[in-house]
């Protein structure tokens, strides 16, 4: 294990390269991160994605929010394709570079249907689940109704864009209450069971092996009679769950107020541990609701490098995570070096033994 003085020397030469959209940097007050990096002995360097990465190196850590760039590349945008391709080449040439977070791992969250499949396959706890879901591929109302029925999706359900990022529409969603409004589905999309959760959304903001839970407003409970009387609710998921949101759809009836379930933070810990294992991410946000009556925990979405609103000491925890990754990398190097040395010594001994044996037999 590296000593404190060794760690200090390690960080003095460490360059954290980053590319984060300006809007996100302003929201985070990026100057605070620059100051923390400087005080911890790191050098923070903004990377120009249009220039050669080699000429901007050497880099020890690359921190990024390239979800939109990746999405555009996958959609055929030539400039985005070139940037992502050059970055992947640079990463391949520098296997010791720490990426927060790996591009392939992030890609697993680009498609909501596939990400829900990953969660469904990876979560094996009776009190934790992802709501029933299905991809809608047809605009025909009767075909949509048939697909929902086969999958056991009941009204109301949430209709979400298939792509989780890369478009301004990624957070434009709707709650559909009946078959007559299936025409409102915007393809490509995923239908997900709506879970009654007493208008409380829990955002689990994860930074490495730490996390913080923020309670946000959400949708009130909907019942069978609502399916007859209500039309589609169109909403932006960012707006409905803002801390300052005052939507009429978040106001509980008096009889529903006692249904609120007090959260169990040990279950949140289990969710965080499992989602990190499933997706292999350092910076991730997990949206969780607690189902009324059953008290089960529903994972309704997972997001890459979220906003972290309400997360105290985010930059300090990020730097701590980077330090831990650097120490783990250094320990791995030392172990690899030790194993290589032992193998060389073993090979030398074997070679000597073989040589002596050959001499012995050659004299007979």
Predicted regions and their residues:
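ATP-dependent carboxylate activation and anion-phosphoryl transfer catalytic cores
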Residues: 260-364
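Conserved acidic residues
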Residues: 58-62
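Short N-terminal binding/cap micro-motifs at the start of the first secondary-structure element
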Residues: 24-30
């Amino acid at each position: 294990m590296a000593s404190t003085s060794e760690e200090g020397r390690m960080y003095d030469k460490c360059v954290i390269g980053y590319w984060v959209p300006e809007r996100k940097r302003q929201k985070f007050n990026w100057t605070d991160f620059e100051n923390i990096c400087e005080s911890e002995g790191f050098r923070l360097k903004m990377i120009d994605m249009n220039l050669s990465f080699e000429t901007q190196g050497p880099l020890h850590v690359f921190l990024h929010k390239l979800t939109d760039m990746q999405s555009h590349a996958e959609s055929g945008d030539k400039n985005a394709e070139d940037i992502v391709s050059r970055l992947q080449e640079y990463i391949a040439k520098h296997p010791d570079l720490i990426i927060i977070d790996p591009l392939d791992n992030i890609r697993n969250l680009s498609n909501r249907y596939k990400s829900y499949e990953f969660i469904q396959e990876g979560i094996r706890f009776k009190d934790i689940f992802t709501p029933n879901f299905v991809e809608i591929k047809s605009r025909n109302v009767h075909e949509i109704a048939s697909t929902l029925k086969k999958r056991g999706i009941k009204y109301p359900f949430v209709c979400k864009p298939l792509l989780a990022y890369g478009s301004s529409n990624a957070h434009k969603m709707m709650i559909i209450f009946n078959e007559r409004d299936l025409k409102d589905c915007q393809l490509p999309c995923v239908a997900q069971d709506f879970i009654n959760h007493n208008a409380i959304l829990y955002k689990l903001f994860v930074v490495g092996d730490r996390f913080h839970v923020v309670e946000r407003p959400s949708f009130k409970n909907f019942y069978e009679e609502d399916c007859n009387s209500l039309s589609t609710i169109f909403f932006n998921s960012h707006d409905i769950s803002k801390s300052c949101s005052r939507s009429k759809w978040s106001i509980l009836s008096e009889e529903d107020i006692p249904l609120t379930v007090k959260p169990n933070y040990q279950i949140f810990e289990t969710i965080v541990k499992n989602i990190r294992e499933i997706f292999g991410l350092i910076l991730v946000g997990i949206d969780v609701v607690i189902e009324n009556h059953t008290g089960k925990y529903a994972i309704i979405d997972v997001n890459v490098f979220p906003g972290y609103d309400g997360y105290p000491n985010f930059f300090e925890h990020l730097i701590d995570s980077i330090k831990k990754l650097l120490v783990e990398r250094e320990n791995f190097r030392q172990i690899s070096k030790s194993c290589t040395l032992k193998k060389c010594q073993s090979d030398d001994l074997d070679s000597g033994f073989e040589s002596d044996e050959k001499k012995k037999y050659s004299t007979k």
